[in-house]
Amino acid sequence: MGTLVFKDSITKEIVTWKHIQSEKVEDYKYLKDELLKQGYTIQSVVLDGKRGLYKAFDNIPKQMCHFHQKKIIQRYITMNPKLEASKDLKKIMTRLTQTNEKNFTEKLNNWYEKYKLFLDEKTISNTTGKLQYTHPRIRSAYRSLRTNLPYLFTHKNYKNLVINNTTNSLEGGVFSHMKNMISLHRGLTKNMKLKLVDYYLINYYKK
């Protein structure tokens, strides 16, 4: 059980939320449509890269959270990569917040050209006896960057909209306090916890 929360990055208000069993794209679409019905104008969204989520916000400028993107890459190549390809990719990632789309894309393209043959290497699996990619994790890291690339620099391409490049105002500003509050009331039933979350979110902006 979790809670999906939409926050206005300009007014800092929690505008809507929904308790969910698991995170689904349909839930995002539902909340988006609810906001539109209430007369809100959605100028942009900052997302964490969940698969299929970009389609839920068609025709709305979308920014991929830099913090989540870095965490995704870190999960695949670790914090202390051993492979040269991984080390070089990590160097590119360290410039994500300082660079622009043109330079970042150029660096990523050059990296791919340099390591293309390495990425395409295959070996025979000891378990299945079939050919498989030798370096699947770094391939996944590259694929994540390539997929999210069109959304990594929206905050710079739409400067007039003043878009955040992370979801930190939710992660640290809302969820961390909410989790602490729930942990202090571990003995509550699920329904009581949901009511506690509702109360917290209703009164969030009034604090």
Question: Language-model segments: which ranges?
Answer:
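Short, function-defining helix-loop hinge/capping sites that tune catalysis or transport
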Residues: T16, A56, Y76, K179-N180
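A generic membrane alpha-helix/interface feature
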Residues: E26, H66, S86, T189-K190, ...
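A broad structural signal for alpha-helix termini and local helix breaks/kinks
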Residues: G39, F57-P61, I182
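Acidic/histidine-rich catalytic cores and adjacent linkers
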Residues: Y40-R51, K91-K207
